[in-house]
Amino acid sequence: MSDDKSQIKIKFFTNEEDVSLQVSDAPLYVPVSLKRYGLSEVVNQLLGNDGENDDSKPIPFDFLIDGVLLRTSIQDYLTKNGLSSETFLSLEYTRAVLPPSFLASFNNEDWISSLDTINKTLPSVTLSNMMISQPKILSGSYDGIVRTYNMSGNVEKQYVGHSGPIRAVKWVSPTRIVSAGNDRQVRLWKTSADDGSIPEEDEEAEDGRTLAILEGHKAPVVALAVENTSNRILSAGYDHSIGFWSTNYKEMTTIQPLEYDSNVLSSSSKKRRKMALQDSTIRRRSPLALLDSHTQPVEDVIFDNTDATVGYSVSQDHTIKTWDLVTSRCIDTRSTGYSLLSIVQLPKSKLLATGSSARHINLHDPRISNNTTEQTTSKLVGHTNFVVSLAASPNNDNMFASGSHDGTVKVWDIRTDKSLYTITRESPEAVKGADKVFAVSWDNEIGIISGGQDKKIQINKGSDISK
């Protein structure tokens, strides 16, 4: 407690569901010099958490005033907002997010461009009517190989077929994955479920083999999104277009193989040229639709969290576009002053977070009219290089993680404009200047997974970080 004689009248309240965390809302006076730690002490005293036994261990809390996280003393908050100590403040308290600690690092053969996870609680499993016993990690690499890892760090299976660097990977179900790369292809692959169950249309293919090659893009395909309720896929291409596909190849039109340009295939790899010839026996499918409106390469694409008929994309043309996937029309365009490289939607608030070449992250509300002057609700600053990957927290509607070419992953809460934590690379290979992060994913069982230039899949997890 501070000796500062200046005090302020406050009351505490919480929206925590745990009734044991409720304190009286009776007003009390506290020193204006108190910060988060001191306020946390007060709440723990009110809760009777004296630390004398395991049941009364003090709990770290965060505090919000009018929905904004308090990151300074009460006095600094009052000064910044032009308020006096005569003000009566209502302070919301919630369990604090603890720092994510380094858990493990898995080796990969080349730079990691993309990551995804699967576990028994995710829609890719629950909507498939299949089972999975342990979480798994899916990686796409610049060596052209897709890999699945178990939680011991062992590669369970490799998927070889792309003739250039992989740029995007996603789980579709426990028995199916999708990948995309610089060879302009989107590929559906067959894997195997823990319980041995295989969808009927997959039975003829061997494990680890390509079910279908999805063709339509005329330049590298750098991002994928999968919508499990509608069984649809979106792909972002450097040909300025977005591909709209089905996870079931039988729903798409059969086509003949595209002619391969010599500059698409790796000029130094006879093996990959031979691989391309072998692909001539694999079924090919055309997109359900190609969405055209962007004027520069499309960097990322997602489905709306609650409406499978809506998609969002970001591009080097500085815009965020909203798509009606029923009519294949662009229904909204929002312009910024910089190339946009990544996008994610936060579930409850519906806000779109976009990472940029200008090193910051903007929050946009797609429900605000495009005609309004202020389309950006907030700007989050902290990275010192391109922000190329974003992942929403699986359990906290206000939080997400960002991966950057500055070699860090940052954890953000939209209720404050500064990052909560910064995760750095743990591998000795990640020397300054060769430590770019290209991919980040956030799994409710595994933790925060990141990968990039150091050829490592790094896992960080903090107690209660998602709560």
UniProtKB/Swiss-Prot annotation:
WD repeat feature ranges: 120-159, 161-199, 216-255, 293-333, 335-374, 382-422, 432-467
SUPFAM superfamilies, A to Z: WD40 repeat-like
Keyword rRNA processing part of the UniProt annotation: yes
Keyword Transmembrane: no
Major localisation: nucleus
Chain segments carrying region Ubiquitin-like (UBL) domain: 8-95
GO biological process, one term: maturation of LSU-rRNA from tricistronic rRNA transcript (SSU-rRNA, 5.8S rRNA, LSU-rRNA)
Keywords: Nucleus, Repeat, Ribosome biogenesis, rRNA processing, WD repeat
GO molecular function: ribonucleoprotein complex binding
GO cellular component: nucleoplasm; PeBoW complex; preribosome, large subunit precursor
Region feature Sufficient for interaction with ERB1 and association with 66S pre-ribosomes, mapped onto this chain: 105-467
Subcellular location: Nucleus, Nucleolus; Nucleus, Nucleoplasm
Binding partners and assembly: Component of the NOP7 complex, composed of ERB1, NOP7 and YTM1. The complex is held together by ERB1, which interacts with NOP7 via its N-terminal domain and with YTM1 via a high-affinity interaction between the seven-bladed beta-propeller domains of the 2 proteins. The NOP7 complex associates with the 66S pre-ribosome. Interacts (via UBL domain) with MDN1 (via VWFA/MIDAS domain).
Function: Component of the NOP7 complex, which is required for maturation of the 25S and 5.8S ribosomal RNAs and formation of the 60S ribosome.
HAMAP family in the cross-refs: WDR12
The family this protein is said to belong to: Belongs to the WD repeat WDR12/YTM1 family.
Name of the molecule in the record: Ribosome biogenesis protein YTM1
Taxonomic lineage of the native organism: Eukaryota, Fungi, Dikarya, Ascomycota, Saccharomycotina
Gene that this polypeptide is encoded by: YTM1
